[in-house]
């Protein structure tokens, strides 16, 4: 502004902004339409007038906009995206069952998704960072899928989603039945693909099937519940992933320290959601984010090396 000799300041909400434009003045700018301060050699007060009365100005502008819209049959450009103060569930819901929405990207204000066709997705964060909330958000978008749920000690998922699950368990006794159902599903997919493998790829075949997702709230507990079928699970997991069955697992940063094959397979992820302070976990490689302060309802969606900060709706 210092490059401009003559300056005019109309009404501004913050009076210090007026001072920054024209400098000190003996006049106080009143809340009168058209009243302004003008700086020539010194600061004076003036009244601005319009050349016409501008009757029905807003209505005429709206009519002109409508007329232009009707005349233009081309694709309308995207509007300027603005991050809402509160992100709600309906803002991130996906129209595809194989890619549930997680949150709004804080840079581009676009929905970020997880791709669910035969992958392991990790939701990692300390207690109280919103891991179960993310699982609930995903389950809200899987009501047309076949879902297997292994719940936490608190049974938070069971209270709302037990009835929609093909199989639900949170004890060691039911782990055998869980394995048998999964084994049957994989065997069915293998035999079905044998019939059509000359006509389509395995990926194309899996995309045509009902989406099957295993949702685990507390992966460490899941491993303990499945200790009697651990060896069988170690063999089954690679096969079920190959045939399009996905796993979504919640984990805290200090878990999965074992060296058994099942733990190794469940740690081998390249997609997921990081909650809390990114540096506090080592499962998903993240760039250093200095002075990051975690706020509930925020996180990072990670997909094959691409990381997006997102605002996540709370359920």
Per-range role (PLM):
Residues 37, 72-87, 191-206:
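Short glycine-rich, low-complexity/disordered patches
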Residues 202-203, 229, 296, 306:
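Hydrophobic alpha-helical segments, principally membrane-spanning helices and signal/leader peptides
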